[in-house]
From Swiss-Prot:
GO BP term, example: regulation of translation
Family according to the record: Belongs to the universal ribosomal protein uL1 family.
Protein name, as recorded: Large ribosomal subunit protein uL1
Species, as recorded: Halalkalibacterium halodurans (strain ATCC BAA-125 / DSM 18197 / FERM 7344 / JCM 9153 / C-125)
Entry keywords, A to Z: Repressor, Ribonucleoprotein, Ribosomal protein, RNA-binding, rRNA-binding, Translation regulation, tRNA-binding
Pfam family, any one: Ribosomal_L1
Matches recorded under PROSITE patterns: RIBOSOMAL_L1 (PS01199)
Keyword hit for Glycosyltransferase: no
An annotated Gene Ontology molecular function: tRNA binding
UniProt function note: Binds directly to 23S rRNA. The L1 stalk is quite mobile in the ribosome, and is involved in E site tRNA release. Protein L1 is also a translational repressor protein, it controls the translation of the L11 operon by binding to its mRNA.
NCBIfam families: rplA_bact (TIGR01169)
GO cellular component terms, A-Z: large ribosomal subunit
């Protein structure tokens, strides 16, 4: 295990690992415990009471954070004709069809999110082996397979984030940067939690929000109380 620096160890002393804090207090601790020389990303991790192995308990989607993520997303749109023009007008960083597919197959990945119109998916699907492992494959559940390309691009640029439960029942989502005001981070946090509560599968039994924690890229995790959220 890598040796922790003095600043990190001092930061850890600020946090009671056994206590679950109120949202804003937890976020304040995350900000105080941020010791990196760059503007760290703040992330929320949620352990859900679901069985991801069951098809009716898969949780996946996307939501636009009210205060964005602090990161500029580079958007690639696969579209033709009028939809390609619409994507360009909306501010997509790259718009193409077969030309971009060929570039990706040769190792080009200068983008963060892909949007594709449904009629392009047969071709985009051929890139599944390279896009899938990187989490870049467009999906209707996250609004990235759509003919509404203008809305899709605008939402991504405004701070849309995707969420997906992993095999252990956890979801990790970025909610901003440590430089954000605590109130803005809290608003983004609550947007994520509210979205997850609404996405609770009917088949999920028992406690739904098992554990919630927030942390910065290089900082320690801080537990958040689940008491004020629907379980």
């Amino acid at each position: 295990m890598a040796k922790r620096g003095k600043k990190y160890l001092e930061a850890v002393k600020l946090i009671d690992r056994d206590q679950a804090y109120q949202v804003e207090e937890a976020l304040e601790l995350v900000k105080k415990a941020s010791v990196a020389k760059f503007d760290e990303t703040v992330e929320v991790a949620v352990r859900l009471g679901v069985d991801p192995k069951k098809a009716d308990q898969q949780i996946r989607g996307a939501v636009v954070l009210p205060n964005g993520t602090g990161k500029t997303q580079r958007v690639l749109v696969f579209a033709k004709g009028e939809k390609a023009k619409e994507a360009e007008a909306a501010g997509a960083d790259y718009v193409g069809d077969e030309d971009c597919i060929n570039k990706i197959s040769q190792g080009w990945f200068d983008f963060d999110v892909i949007v594709a119109t449904p009629d392009m998916m047969a071709q985009v699907g051929k890139l599944g082996r390279v896009l899938g492992p990187k989490g870049l494959m467009p999906n209707p559940k996250t609004g990235t397979v759509t003919f509404e390309v203008e809305k899709a691009v605008n939402d991504i640029k405004a701070g849309k984030v995707e969420y997906r439960v992993d095999k252990a029942g956890n979801i990790h989502v970025p909610i901003g940067k440590v430089s954000f005001d605590t109130a803005k981070l809290a608003e983004n946090f609550e947007t994520i939690i509210d979205t997850l509560v609404k996405a609770k599968p009917a088949a999920a039994k028992g406690t739904y929000l098992k554990n919630i924690a927030v942390s910065s890229t290089m900082g320690p995790g801080v537990k958040v109380s689940t008491a004020s959220f629907g379980k």
